[in-house]
C-alpha cells in the first residue's frame, strides 16, 4: 500500500498526549498507570486508520486498548477516529512490531490482534510477516498463559502460511473460519480493509490461537 506522506502528522499526534503515547518505552511494565485502572490490555499491531481499534474500545469499555502503527501518516487518521469516538480506554503508539519488547513487560498484554497485515508474498520477505515464528516468539513473551492472538485477513496464502506457522509453533487453534462474514461468529468489528474487500465478494479468513503452555 502506498501511503501519502503527511509532514504534519507527528506534530498533530503530539498535540494529544492523552491519546498518543510518544515514548511508550517509558511505560514498560506500567501501562495500568497510563489507563488508571487494572483492566486487561489488548493491542492491535498494524492499526492502520483505526476503525477496528476505536470500535473495539467503544464496544468494550472494560478493556484497555493500544493501537500500534509504525507509520505516523497513517496513525494520525486513527487519532481522529479516537477523538471522535471519545474512548478513554484507547491509546495509540507509533512503533515497529519488532520493538514491542522495548515497550511492554513480559505477560503485560492480554490479547493481540493482527488484522489484514501486509502479506509480504515474496519468499525472501517471509520473515517480515507478522505471523512468522520470529514474531510469534515476541508475542509469546508478551502474553500471559491464557493470552490469545486473533488474526484476520483476506489473503488466503497468508492465512494458510499462518495456520502452518501457528501449528508448527505448537499453538492451539481455538477458532478457524474460512468465510467469517457467512459464519455464526458474533461481535465482529470490521476494519477499513475488511469493508473494502468483503464488498467485492472476497471471503474473510479468521483464526484465534493461544500458546500451548504447561
Swiss-Prot record:
Keyword flag tRNA processing: yes
UniProt key word Transferase: yes
Keywords (A to Z) from UniProt: Methyltransferase, S-adenosyl-L-methionine, Transferase, tRNA processing
Entry superkingdom: Bacteria
One GO MF term attached to the UniProt entry: tRNA (guanine(46)-N7)-methyltransferase activity
Active site location: 118
Gene Ontology cellular-component terms listed: tRNA methyltransferase complex
Catalytic activity, as annotated: guanosine(46) in tRNA + S-adenosyl-L-methionine = N(7)-methylguanosine(46) in tRNA + S-adenosyl-L-homocysteine
Enzyme Commission identifier(s): 2.1.1.33
Alphabetical list of PROSITE patterns matching this protein: SAM_MT_TRMB
A Pfam short name: Methyltransf_4
Function in brief: Catalyzes the formation of N(7)-methylguanine at position 46 (m7G46) in tRNA.
Family: Belongs to the class I-like SAM-binding methyltransferase superfamily. TrmB family.
Protein name (Swiss-Prot/TrEMBL): tRNA (guanine-N(7)-)-methyltransferase
Name of encoding gene: trmB
Amino acid at each position: 500500500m502506498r501511503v501519502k506522506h503527511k509532514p504534519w502528522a507527528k506534530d498533530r499526534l503530539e498535540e494529544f498526549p492523552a491519546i498518543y503515547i510518544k515514548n511508550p518505552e517509558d511505560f514498560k511494565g506500567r501501562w495500568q498507570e497510563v489507563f488508571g485502572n487494572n483492566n486487561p490490555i489488548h493491542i492491535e499491531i498494524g492499526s492502520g486508520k483505526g476503525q477496528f481499534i476505536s470500535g473495539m474500545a467503544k464496544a468494550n469499555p472494560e478493556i484497555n486498548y493500544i493501537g500500534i502503527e509504525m507509520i505516523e501518516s497513517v496513525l494520525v487518521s486513527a487519532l481522529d477516529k479516537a477523538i471522535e469516538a471519545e474512548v478513554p480506554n484507547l491509546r495509540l503508539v507509533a512503533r515497529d512490531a519488532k520493538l514491542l519488547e522495548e515497550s511492554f513487560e513480559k505477560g503485560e498484554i492480554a490479547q493481540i490482534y493482527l488484522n489484514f497485515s501486509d502479506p509480504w508474498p515474496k519468499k525472501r520477505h517471509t520473515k517480515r510477516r507478522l505471523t512468522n515464528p520470529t514474531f510469534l516468539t515476541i508475542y509469546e513473551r508478551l502474553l500471559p498463559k491464557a493470552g490469545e492472538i486473533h488474526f484476520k485477513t483476506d489473503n488466503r496464502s497468508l492465512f494458510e502460511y499462518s495456520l502452518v506457522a501457528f501449528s508448527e509453533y505448537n499453538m492451539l487453534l481455538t477458532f478457524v473460519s474460512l468465510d467469517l462474514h457467512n459464519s455464526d461468529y458474533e461481535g465482529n468489528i470490521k476494519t477499513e480493509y475488511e469493508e473494502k474487500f468483503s464488498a467485492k465478494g472476497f471471503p474473510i479468513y479468521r483464526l484465534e490461537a493461544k500458546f500451548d503452555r504447561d
